Regions:
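C-terminal hydrophobic helical "lid"/dimerization subdomain
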Residues: 235-280
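NAD(P)H dinucleotide-binding glycine-rich loop of Rossmann-like/cofactor-binding domains
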Residues: 46-111
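Glycine-rich phosphate-binding loop and adjacent beta-alpha segment
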Residues: 184-251
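Glycine-rich beta-strand-centered segment in the early N-terminal region that forms part
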Residues: 1, 9-51
Length: 280
């Protein structure tokens, strides 16, 4: 996860005190505890909250967390599948649910920015699985075939997209969007969303500022919705895990890369440079 990379590289905005064990996602077996809710041997998942930020996280062999952070792993998910989904998958799923709640009935494509990242790639897969036409936005020309293989109908190169002239309100190009990057990409897409569409915003790697006008909101009734899966209520997280184990079951094998702890640093460097593809 991007937040893991920030913590591992000494970002005091994420982790205040070092040395520290990062990892905002974990899956494993209860070895000890004082809760009546779980017993020794139960297979569980923990994502988000303070874990991996200032509470030692999933890069360790053992973790000690409040019971309120813990979800029982669905039987139809392996630990590998659960961690291939992780916080990124929960964020993508929360974004998809927000879009599905909208009254937008356009048959225009759904735009997914940062589409090769963890949130973006799972967002592409989910939207495609739900029968939506997906336009994947990426800065990596080498990832076009990867994006098509996981469900993207169209791949848009980021530089070409950003170079095109912008207006305060434009011809609708997309029904809704999952934006994982923020900044100028988010600013660019807002005037292109069709009436009553939703933009689910969940990232800021392209910047924390958004340059827009009120026109997309008051002339088309679009909604810009913030997505924060880390602090979501545990019941909401549990419902998403059940979906991933059932009707939203995904074949994640094309997008995962397994490494040892000894090779973590090179993956941390890669994600900070925007070079990671899928989930590690």
């Amino acid at each position: 996860n991007y937040k893991d990379a920030l913590s591992a590289s000494g970002n005091k905005g994420v982790t205040r005190h070092y040395p520290f064990v990062p990892g905002i996602d974990a899956a494993g077996v209860i070895s000890d505890g004082n809760s009546l809710q779980f017993t020794e041997g139960d297979e569980v998942i923990v994502t988000g909250y303070d874990m991996g930020m200032n509470t030692p996280g999933g890069f360790g062999e053992y973790i000690n967390v409040p019971v309120e952070w813990v979800v029982k792993k669905p039987d139809n998910l392996t630990n590998l599948e659960a961690m291939s989904i992780g916080t990124a998958g929960l964020t993508a799923a929360a974004s998809v649910l927000k879009i599905l709640e909208s009254s937008n009935e356009s048959d225009l494509p759904v735009l997914v920015s940062g589409a090769t990242g963890g949130v973006g790639s799972i967002g592409v897969m989910l939207m495609s699985k739900l029968g939506k036409e997906v336009s994947a936005l990426t800065g990596k020309s080498s990832s076009v075939e990867f994006l098509k293989s996981i469900g993207a109908a169209n791949v848009i190169m980021r530089d070409n997209y950003l170079e095109a002239p912008s207006k305060a309100i434009e011809r609708p190009l997309f029904s809704c969007a999952i934006d994982t990057v923020g900044g100028n990409v988010l600013s660019k897409m807002l005037p292109q969303i069709s009436p009553h569409g939703v933009v689910a915003c969940c990232g800021n790697v392209a910047g924390i500022e958004v340059n827009t006008t009120v026109f997309p909101f008051i002339l088309r009734g679009i909604s810009l919705c913030g997505i924060d899966s880390a602090e979501s209520p545990i019941d909401f997280k549990n419902s998403i895990w059940q979906k991933f184990a059932d009707e939203w079951k995904l074949d994640l094998s094309p997008m995962i890369k397994i490494v040892t702890k000894e090779n973590l640093q090179q993956e941390i460097d890669l994600i900070l440079k925007g070079g990671q593809q899928g989930r590690v």
